[in-house]
Swiss-Prot record:
Residues 1-24 form a propeptide. The keyword Transmembrane helix applies. SUPFAM superfamilies: Photosystem II reaction center protein K, PsbK (SSF161037). This is Photosystem II reaction center protein K. The lineage of its organism: Eukaryota, Viridiplantae, Streptophyta, Embryophyta, Tracheophyta. Pfam families: PsbK (PF02533). Keywords: Chloroplast, Membrane, Photosynthesis, Photosystem II, Plastid, Reaction center, Thylakoid, Transmembrane, Transmembrane helix. It is a single-pass membrane protein.
Length: 61
């Protein structure tokens, strides 16, 4: 249980600290990475949901 709590704290902490970068603009040479960069803050949430579904599949052992 402690591991799940620490994972949630890490995800929330990184999301709060990276919120200032949401409005940053990439240099012109890397403009084609914009869709990937926009999606990157969501990735920790997807890992959390994957862990939740996995635990539900094994009946929260």
């Amino acid at each position: 249980m402690l591991n799940i709590f620490s994972l949630i704290c890490i995800c929330l902490n990184s999301a709060l600290h990276s919120s200032s970068f949401f409005f940053a603009k990439l240099p012109e040479a890397y403009a084609f990475f914009n869709p990937i960069v926009d999606f990157m803050p969501v990735i920790p949430v997807l890992f959390f949901l994957l862990a939740l579904v996995w635990q539900a599949a094994v009946s929260f052992r």
